């Protein structure tokens, strides 16, 4: 392989041990990997782990793989990991906090070199020096990365207020997580009076039922803020069941910027978040820890994308 790539055996070793970062050029690494592919070589991960004590694998723990947001998150983390010679193992907790905590504890003592925990608390016994990054949450002992959900929600609600809406309802997440508390706080701060609110999980059936309940009980609502674009899609279904046009009778704003929002009719105004960037940054923070550094936590910006689902009330 070294002969095929035109490099030394030690250079090949650096590439496949993951120790070549900063020591060999990207062109040289690409040549080595191309030679390996031509020769059909695949490194033995198990043998390497026994020899080095490192599995070159990180675990990403998420609450719901059925939500497309987490596909983007995985893609971002995986792309960054692959460039660094790591694999990403995905764990789905199915929104079970206890299972998430148990998974994190097991992975901490198991095959993963580091943990990326989405809305999962780090194991209580985990030292601050252990390679753990929390996503969309906060931990005193570990670096975190999250979206600026509060500012994004403020932008969405202000957009509705500027259009002239005064009666704004909130189809909120049923899950009591930091990001959803920030969204709820922003809505409560900006909307006058008591906010008409219902709760939904991130399925169309749940969102349809919740939005139907909200709109039936509060016929004076002219706009809805939804904690997710899937929830917004359920609100579309409820509005049409009740004979409400969008945006003529009801304006709707979602969150996350998922593809489903673009195919709704009309496309939903949404607070767009870059899930891939969130995953990439999370992995970079983890790599910094693995290199012995103490990276700072990050807050990533979001952006309101105004589409066809919002207009001035009649």
Can you say where each PLM-predicted feature lies in the sequence?
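N-terminal helix-turn-helix DNA-binding module of bacterial transcription factors
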Residues: 1-55, 314
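Short beta-strand segments enriched in small/hydrophobic residues
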Residues: 11-14, 50-64, 159, 167-173
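Short gly/ser/thr-rich secondary-structure transition/capping motifs
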Residues: 39-44, 98, 116-117, 236
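Hinge/beta->alpha junction and helix N-cap segments in small-molecule ligand-binding domains
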Residues: 45, 63-72, 91-99, 145-155, ...
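Alpha-helical recognition/docking segments in bacterial nutrient-uptake
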Residues: 57-158, 162, 214-216, 220
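Periplasmic-binding protein-like
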Residues: 104, 111-119, 167-172, 197-198, ...
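Flexible loop/turn connectors
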Residues: 217-314
């Amino acid at each position: 392989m070294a002969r095929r790539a035109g490099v030394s055996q030690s250079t090949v070793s650096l590439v496949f041990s993951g120790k070549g970062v900063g020591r060999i050029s990207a062109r040289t690494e690409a040549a080595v990997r191309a030679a390996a592919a031509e020769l059909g070589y695949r490194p033995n991960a198990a043998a390497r782990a026994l020899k080095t004590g490192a599995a070159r694998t990180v675990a990403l723990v998420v609450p719901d793989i059925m939500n497309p947001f987490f596909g983007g998150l995985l893609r971002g983390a995986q792309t960054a990991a692959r460039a660094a010679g790591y694999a990403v193992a995905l764990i789905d907790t199915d929104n079970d906090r206890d299972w998430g905590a148990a998974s994190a504890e097991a992975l901490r003592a198991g095959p993963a070199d580091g943990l990326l925990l989405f809305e999962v608390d780090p194991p209580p016994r985990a030292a601050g020096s252990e390679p753990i990054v929390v996503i969309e949450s906060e931990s005193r002992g570990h670096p975190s990365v999250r979206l600026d959900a509060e500012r994004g929600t403020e932008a969405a609600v202000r957009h509705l207020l500027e259009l002239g809406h005064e009666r704004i309802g909130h189809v909120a997440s049923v899950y009591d997580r930091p990001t959803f508390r920030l969204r709820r706080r922003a809505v409560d701060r900006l909307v006058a009076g008591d906010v008409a609110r219902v709760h939904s999980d991130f399925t169309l059936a749940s969102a349809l039922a919740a939005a139907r309940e909200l709109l039936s009980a509060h016929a004076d609502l002219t706009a809805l803020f939804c904690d997710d674009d899937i929830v917004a899609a359920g609100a579309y279904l409820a509005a049409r069941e009740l004979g409400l046009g969008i945006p003529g009778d009801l304006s709707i704003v979602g969150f996350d910027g998922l593809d489903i929002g673009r195919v709704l009719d009309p496309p939903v105004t949404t607070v767009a978040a870059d899930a891939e960037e969130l995953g990439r940054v999370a992995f970079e923070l983890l790599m910094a820890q693995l290199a012995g550094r103490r990276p700072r936590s990050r807050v990533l910006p979001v952006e309101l994308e105004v589409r066809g689902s919002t207009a001035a009330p009649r």
